[in-house]
């Protein structure tokens, strides 16, 4: 332990010395005048040039003398040439001793990795075939005071990558790719829904009554109104108010907040897509979800086969559709239907499986507890799990043939819940009764039970058309499409404990 501490202290002293040297260089730049100029305008991106001129030979480029202006961060400085990086990629810039003044040539030698420069010149190709910019002008735009991570080891400390995402993005192409994919996924989802006549909307983040999901909210205080408020746990009840109002197809992509544990699958602040369509049911949403996921896989991976860890998920095949009840029996053949239909036996199974059983749960909730403990983690390929008991689905419509369950599904891939959807409950009186049952659950000690929302009941009393709604966790979806093991890998700035 002592050796590790000494090594850490030595590294810190070395970094401090490098920072001090860079600050001296910045002081010299300040003495010359404006050390942070902002009058350069580039006309090209590094990777765009690589793509656009990939088929041009050395001779063709020399004859064309194509002028370009690029800018980026120095990732390599050999004195005779540098490699710079912008948001699209990298390109070499050649230090031409014939066209650059002596003062500039001397300055280039003092520039450090991480410095940001502008470069003007013409495109050329090296004998090895690399595209580069033969510079006629180069300037320092921003002096970097902190050294980049060692190029041989990179930024490998996972916690440091999360805490200093800006450095992670500078040095890790894999990280940059992940967040480009995330942006691509969100953009395509938006396009997919708008093409199907959905209207994008925004609903309140601050709410007086948290609702729309079984979760513990963050609480805050509105000073001007002198009242308690909550960060939303879901936008559902507001989106359904919009359906009541006549916006029959709506969606929102935004943040939700849940004051719960942190894990590789959970972050207290996360991004959710929720959409609602009138005159549809949960089966329509299954079809829509399969279509969306296939398009996203094809867009990102060029295939409907999605590699994740040592597995491959097949989005091109029909997703399995199985009820909660049937899935328990399928994946636990030692259990019988009679076991699941007896309250005392179901309670015993749930407790033995590791569920937190309080003792007042009904049969439906116990079945879901058993499912969560004994089945969820076994659902590797895409599964629509349907027919959730009404006790755990306070906002979902009861099934016409079996009122003990609801017209609801959750989508599981790789043992993780990715989406939750149902035919919406539009019976105002039934909704009021279910809210009251949730209040009783909360009084009995369930922190995640819902509050009574009188205004939402009033909205339903005006009449909501038959509607289907769905929520899809964007972060978990991006995890799948980028083969990322932790939700923190796909959130730019995940929540972390304060450093000691």
Swiss-Prot record:
EC numbers listed for it are 6.1.1.6
Q: How is the cofactor bound?
A: Binds 3 Mg(2+) ions per subunit.
Q: Where does Mg(2+) 2 bind?
A: 417
Catalysis performed (reactions): tRNA(Lys) + L-lysine + ATP = L-lysyl-tRNA(Lys) + AMP + diphosphate
The main enzyme category here is ligase
The yes or no answer to whether the keyword Transmembrane is present is no
Per the UniProt entry, what is one GO biological process? lysyl-tRNA aminoacylation
Q: Where in the cell is it found?
A: Cytoplasm
Record Pfam families: tRNA-synt_2, tRNA_anti-codon
Lineage, top-rank taxon, reads: Bacteria
Main localization of the protein described in the UniProt heading: cytoplasm
InterPro entries according to UniProt: Aa-tRNA-synt_II (IPR004364), aa-tRNA-synth_II (IPR006195), aa-tRNA-synth_II/BPL/LPL (IPR045864), Lys-tRNA-ligase_II (IPR002313), Lys-tRNA-ligase_II_N (IPR044136), Lys-tRNA-synth_II_C (IPR018149), NA-bd_OB-fold (IPR012340), NA-bd_OB_tRNA (IPR004365)
Q: For binding Mg(2+) 1, which residues are annotated in this chain's numbering?
A: 410, 417
Designated name of the protein: Lysine--tRNA ligase
């Amino acid at each position: 332990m002592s050796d590790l501490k000494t090594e850490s202290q030595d590294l810190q002293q070395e970094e401090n010395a490098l920072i001090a040297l860079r600050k001296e260089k910045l002081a010299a730049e300040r003495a010359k005048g404006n050390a942070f100029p902002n009058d350069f305008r580039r006309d090209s991106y590094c990777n765009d040039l690589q793509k656009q001129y990939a088929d041009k030979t050395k001779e063709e480029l020399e004859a064309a003398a194509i002028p370009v202006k690029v800018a980026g961060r120095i990732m390599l400085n050999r004195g005779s040439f540098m490699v710079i990086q912008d948001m699209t990629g990298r390109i070499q810039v050649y230090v031409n001793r014939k066209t650059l003044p002596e003062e500039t040539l001397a300055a280039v030698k003092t520039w450090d990795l991480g410095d940001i420069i502008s470069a003007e010149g013409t495109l050329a190709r090296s004998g090895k075939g690399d595209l580069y910019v033969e510079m006629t002008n180069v300037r320092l735009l921003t002096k970097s005071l902190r050294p980049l991570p060692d190029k041989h080891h990179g930024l490998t400390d996972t916690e440091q990558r999360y805490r200093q995402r800006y450095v992670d993005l500078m040095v890790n192409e894999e990280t940059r790719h992940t967040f480009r994919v995330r942006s691509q996924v969100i953009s395509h989802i938006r396009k997919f829904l708008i093409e199907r006549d959905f209207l994008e909307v925004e609903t309140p983040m601050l709410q007086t009554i948290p609702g729309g999901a079984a979760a513990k909210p963050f609480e805050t205080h509105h000073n001007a109104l002198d009242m308690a408020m909550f960060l939303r746990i879901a936008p559902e009840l507001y989106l359904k108010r919009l359906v009541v109002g006549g916006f029959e197809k709506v969606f929102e992509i935004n943040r939700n907040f849940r004051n719960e544990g942190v894990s590789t699958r959970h972050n207290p602040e996360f991004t959710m897509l929720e959409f609602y369509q009138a005159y549809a049911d949960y089966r329509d949403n299954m079809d829509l979800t399969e279509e969306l996921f296939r398009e996203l896989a094809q867009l990102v991976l060029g295939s409907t086969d999605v590699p994740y860890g040592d597995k491959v998920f097949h989005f091109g095949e029909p997703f399995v559709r199985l009820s909660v009840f049937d899935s328990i029996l399928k994946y636990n053949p030692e259990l019988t239907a009679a076991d699941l239909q007896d309250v005392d036996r179901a309670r015993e199974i749930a407790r033995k499986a590791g569920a937190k059983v309080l003792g007042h749960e009904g049969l439906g909730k116990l079945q879901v507890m058993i499912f969560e403990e004994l089945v969820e983690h076994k659902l590797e390929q895409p599964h629509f799990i349907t027919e959730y008991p009404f006790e755990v689905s306070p906002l979902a419509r009861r099934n016409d043939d079996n009122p003990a369950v609801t017209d609801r599904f959750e989508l599981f891939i790789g043992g993780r819940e990715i989406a939750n959807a149902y035919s919406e409950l539009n019976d105002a009186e039934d909704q009021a009764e279910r809210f009251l049952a949730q209040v009783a659950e909360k009084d009995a000690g369930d922190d995640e039970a819902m509050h009574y929302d009188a205004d939402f009941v009033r909205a339903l009393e005006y009449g909501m058309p038959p509607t289907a709604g769905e929520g899809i966790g964007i972060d978990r979806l991006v995890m799948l499409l980028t083969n990322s093991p932790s939700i923190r890998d796909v959130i730019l700035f995940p929540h972390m404990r304060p450093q000691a």
